[in-house]
């Protein structure tokens, strides 16, 4: 038997203690199964009931804690609706405080979206009927209450909203919801030992140390061997994610925010600011387990060090471990080139009617040195027009617009290729970004659109502006 020095014994003891102390999901063998939000597939005339209420969830294993959600479930159901249908919404607020809701990315008038101007008081209902006219996309709904959107969204008032059309279902893409078409809602949180969400309303920005995906920490999912589609939403308040696979495998970026790209883009990494969505395809024909992560690959010792540290890093940066099973898929031996029909690149040749510049001061939560004033209109745009907006910020931050859509023209002076251009409503500002904004929906003084920081902590401090489109 080998002699063990006192120093080695101490190190071994500390390591063993650490292993017993860390959260179970840090150990791959104990990962929970990914929860898939319930699917509400609406058809013409079928109402969509969304009851905002208290409920319970297990954010930590074996600990039930009070959260918020819809229809008795933490987070909301995924709404799937077809283009040219009508969304017959029925919001009901069963919470003890008033709430305003936004459907981010939905192309409709200010009166139908509601947004910050439509506060639902306790026990109040609202039932707008919204025509769905836009191309296939992955949108999301969340609380947007003035000065309280971050807290309410953090508690669980959010969900996915998927739009399809006849053409998008014939493209050969994975489309079995929860099987090979997987929704991933990313949230970072701070919890106490009982699993209760911790939140400070007046802190500058919110960076939680634990990463949750559909309400689960570092989950896994057994999927069919073959091509898998991941729809990823950054629903965090402030944190930006750097998505990649832990084996550095290539994936195909096919869509972002408001629709498909002209053609699939081969990537190893993609950045995702708050409110941004991407759809990616990953080939799992090799049958090997692989994890989608944020940042760089870590070992168990790295995770343990982050668990005992306080550096703003996530304890575990695993988003989802994919465990493929079954026979190889149809794409095993041929390279698929994905082409999609989108009019987004045509905006590059459209006449620009006005140019504007917006600078976000992250430290002071201002846009062009101003905070939100409900009595002041910050942008008045003409219906049907196209404007060029130049966006900059004092430090990296997400930006979002409601009721309109845009394409990214250039990033830090470098123009995007036409094949990379798709419709968006949210973007990361890291330096200077030029976007072309198209206004196809009306808003009014009573129901204005908003634009500004997609970081809801900053938005609650007034880092947004009001927009009239007539």
Swiss-Prot record:
Post-translational modification: Predicted to be exported by the Tat system. The position of the signal peptide cleavage has not been experimentally proven.
Name of the coding gene: ftsP
Gene3D superfamilies noted in UniProt: Cupredoxins - blue copper proteins
GO biological process, one term: FtsZ-dependent cytokinesis
GO MF, any single term: copper ion binding
Record lineage: Bacteria, Pseudomonadati, Pseudomonadota, Gammaproteobacteria, Pasteurellales
Pfam families: Cu-oxidase_3 (PF07732)
Protein name: Cell division protein FtsP
Classification via InterPro entries: Cu-oxidase-like_N, Cu-oxidase_fam, Cupredoxin, FtsP, TAT_signal
Compartments reported by the entry: Periplasm
Predominant location category: periplasm
Family: Belongs to the FtsP family.
General function of this protein: Cell division protein that is required for growth during stress conditions. May be involved in protecting or stabilizing the divisomal assembly under conditions of stress.
UniProt keyword annotations, A-Z: Cell cycle, Cell division, Periplasm, Signal
Organism of origin: Aggregatibacter aphrophilus (strain NJ8700)
Stored HAMAP family: FtsP
Signal peptide: 1-29
PANTHER family, per database record: BILIRUBIN OXIDASE, CUPREDOXIN SUPERFAMILY PROTEIN
Entry's Gene Ontology cellular component terms: cell division site; outer membrane-bounded periplasmic space
């Amino acid at each position: 038997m080998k002699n063990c020095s006192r120093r080695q014994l101490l190190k071994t003891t500390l390591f063993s203690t650490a292993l017993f102390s860390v959260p179970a999901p840090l150990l791959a063998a104990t990962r929970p199964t990914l929860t898939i939000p319930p699917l509400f597939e609406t058809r013409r005339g079928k109402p969509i009931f969304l009851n905002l209420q208290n409920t319970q969830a297990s954010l930590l294993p074996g600990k039930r804690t009070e959260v918020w959600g819809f229809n008795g479930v933490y987070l909301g159901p995924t709404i799937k609706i077809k283009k040219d249908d009508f969304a017959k919404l029925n919001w009901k607020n069963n919470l003890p405080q008033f709430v305003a809701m936004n459907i981010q990315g939905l192309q409709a008038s200010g009166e139908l979206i509601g947004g910050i101007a439509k506060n639902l008081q306790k026990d109040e209902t609202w039932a707008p009927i919204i025509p769905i006219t836009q191309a296939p996309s992955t949108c999301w709904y969340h609380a947007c209450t003035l000065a309280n959107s971050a807290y309410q969204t953090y508690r669980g008032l959010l969900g996915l909203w998927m739009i399809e059309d006849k053409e998008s279902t014939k493209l050969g893409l994975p489309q079995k919801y929860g099987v090979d078409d997987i929704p991933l809602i990313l949230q970072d949180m701070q919890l106490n030992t009982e699993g209760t969400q911790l939140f400070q309303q007046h802190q500058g920005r919110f960076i939680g140390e634990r990463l949750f995906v559909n309400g689960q920490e570092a989950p896994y999912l057994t999927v069919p061997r073959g091509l898998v589609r991941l729809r990823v939403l950054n629903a965090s308040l402030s944190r930006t994610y750097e998505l990649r696979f832990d084996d550095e495998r290539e994936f195909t970026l096919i869509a972002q925010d408001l629709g498909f790209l002209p053609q699939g883009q081969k990537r190893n990494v993609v950045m995702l600011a708050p409110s941004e969505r991407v759809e990616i395809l990953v080939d799992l024909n090799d049958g090997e387990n692989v994890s989608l992560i944020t940042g760089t690959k870590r070992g168990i010792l790295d995770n343990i060090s982050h668990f005992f540290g306080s550096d703003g890093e996530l304890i575990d940066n695993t988003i989802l471990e994919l465990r493929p099973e079954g026979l190889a898929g149809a794409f095993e031996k041929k390279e698929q080139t994905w082409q999609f029909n989108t009019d987004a690149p045509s905006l590059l040749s459209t006449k620009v009617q006005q140019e504007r510049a917006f600078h976000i001061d992250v430290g002071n939560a201002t846009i062009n040195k101003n905070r939100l004033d409900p009595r002041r209109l910050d942008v008045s745009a003409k219906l049907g027009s196209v404007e060029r907006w130049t966006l900059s910020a004092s430090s990296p931050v997400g930006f979002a617009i409601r009721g309109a859509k845009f394409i990214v023209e250039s990033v830090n002076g470098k123009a995007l290729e036409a094949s990379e251009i798709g419709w968006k409503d949210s973007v990361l500002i890291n330096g200077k970004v030029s976007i072309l904004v198209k206004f196809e929906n009306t808003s009014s003084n009573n129901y204005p659109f908003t634009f500004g920081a997609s970081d809801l902590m900053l938005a609650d401090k007034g880092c947004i502006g009001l927009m009239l489109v007539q």
